[in-house]
Design a protein with these regions (language model features):
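Conserved short alpha-helical segments that host acidic/polar catalytic motifs at enzyme active sites
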Residues: 1-223, 228-288, 293, 381
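Phosphate/diphosphate-binding loops
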Residues: 160, 208-209, 216-217, 221-225, ...
């Protein structure tokens, strides 16, 4: 419900025998729909022949029974759901990306955001390479293919490509004979794998996706690790594993991931409950009821209620048939959707002092409208509490906040923000508090650069989402 936009979810499956894998991928993607609702797609490998389909829209609308039939059988398949953080919302930017090269074919699905995609793409274009999309995923594909021409195996090519691509990426790669999963050396985005009772190996962005297809969770893929699934079993390549400290994006726990997922050993639901408990201790207020913003604020609201002793109530009802507000790129569209997405429970909040819990405030537009809804429903006070610190820095690793321009916390004090959104008071989770919601030690931790400005990698210049479109348009105008 917050105004944050994340990017994608990936899914891959390797089967020892040929079968209708697209049906399994469909269910896997359906359980990852929360990670991206702009477009989706599936690619299937049938004895080295790749079939694929992708389009704009939700999984249920794009991957129809007729599409599943046309994709046919195979023993390897990959799938993707997208919200773009580099490149616009065009069909050409939908994934998986399927490419043919002199040594065969490759399909790639990627979750994350490169910080050097512009530089790499410029190098490729200077050498005559042609790009068909404006996504950084195609930059990854070009890099792997260039390395593949020199390497003996696809996994060697991926390993060498990881020396060149910088930033956040969790990806699945399909070659004629193998399924490969790879995670960047910081582990910004989650990736895990499991195994079904039928012997299929399944890779997914979140463990909830494994559950949906009946796969038993085996483990998370480590930061910097490459895992290869093939006819000879599983191979792990850890050449890049010890290069950096793990810095998983903390918003995976706060917002992005489904509460029934386990990421890097931590249950997402428990992390959100704990965030709410800490928030209550750090930002107490006298009130009658605690209300969470559906769906992302509900678990933290339960934690706040538990720690404060203030009753929890369902004060806002979500229309489940309206997509997440952040999926609609234009601000006006997002604001219009809020009107029909949430409805206050007047009988619950009328005459009450309400504590409203959400996971973040980025621009403030959505928060202000929700506060207004509660007041119109009869709430006599609305105290907003946020289960994350103020968002004051751009994210370069997969959240669609590429500039400080629209970050309300960069422009106003907490008291001023409270006034702008119409809340009686406003409180945020502290930096120390957010570090306590998961496992943090000398070897692993969170990326909280959007809160404290300490980036785990070299700080890039601010990169705008549609930079490749702008470059193309500039070339056309010459």
């Amino acid at each position: 419900m917050s105004e944050i936009r994340e990017e994608c979810g990936v899914f891959g499956i390797y089967s020892p025998k040929k079968e209708n894998l697209s049906q399994i991928v469909y269910f896997g993607l359906f359980s990852l729909q929360h990670r991206g609702q702009e477009s989706c797609g599936i690619a299937v490998n049938n004895e080295g022949i790749f079939s694929s389909y992708k389009d704009l829209g939700l999984v249920n609308d794009v991957i129809t029974p007729s599409v599943i039939d046309k994709l046919g059988e195979g023993n390897i398949a990959v799938g993707h759901v997208r919200y773009g953080t580099t490149g616009g919302n065009e069909r050409s930017n939908a994934q998986p990306i399927v490419v043919n090269h002199i040594k065969g074919s490759m399909a790639l699905a990627h979750n994350g955001n490169l910080i050097n995609s512009y530089e790499l793409r410029s190098e490729f274009e200077a050498k005559g390479s042609i790009f068909h999309t404006t996504s950084d995923t195609e930059v990854i594909a070009h890099t792997i293919i260039e390395e593949r021409l020199k390497a003996d195996t696809i996994e060697e090519a991926v390993c060498e490509a990881m020396n060149r691509i910088k930033g956040a990426y969790s990806m699945v790669i399909m070659s004629p004979q193998k399924l490969i999963a790879a995670r960047d050396e910081n582990g910004f985005r989650p990736l895990c794998y499991g195994k079904t009772a039928n012997g299929e190996y399944v890779v997914a962005s979140e463990s909830c996706s494994l559950d949906s297809v009946g796969a038993e969770f085996i483990r998370d893929i480590e930061k910097g690790e490459i895992v290869v699934f093939g006819k000879d079993g599983i191979t792990s390549i850890k050449k890049h594993c010890n290069k950096s400290k793990q810095t998983l994006c903390v918003f995976e726990y706060i917002y992005f991931a489904r509460p029934d997922s386990i990421i890097d050993g931590k249950n997402v639901y428990e992390a959100r409950i704990k965030a709410g408990e800490i928030l209550a201790k750090e930002n107490p207020v006298n009130a009658d009821i605690v209300v969470g913003v559906p769906d992302s604020g509900l678990d933290a609201a339960l934690g706040y209620s538990k720690a404060s002793g203030i009753p929890y109530g369902i004060g806002l009802i979500k229309n489940k048939y309206i997509g997440r507000t952040f999926i609609h790129p234009e601000v006006k569209s997002r604001m219009d959707k809020v009107k029909i997405k949430l409805n206050p429970m007047a009988n619950v909040v009328k005459g009450k002092r309400v504590i409203l819990i959400d996971d973040s405030i980025v621009r403030g537009t959505t928060s202000g409208r929700i506060v207004k809804l509660l007041r119109e429903a009869g709430a006599i006070e609305v105290h907003m509490r946020v289960s994350a610190p103020p968002f004051v820095n751009p994210c370069y690793y997969g959240i669609d906040i590429d500039s400080k321009d629209n970050l309300i916390a960069c422009k106003y004090t907490i008291e001023e923000i409270a006034k702008k959104i119409g809340a009686d008071t406003l409180g945020y989770l502290s930096l120390d508090g957010v570090k306590k919601i998961g496992y943090v030690n000398e070897k692993s931790g969170f990326c909280i650069a959007c809160f404290d400005g300490n980036y785990p990698t070299k700080i890039p210049t601010e990169k705008f989402k549609n930079r490749f479109e702008r470059k193309i348009n500039e070339e056309k105008s010459k």
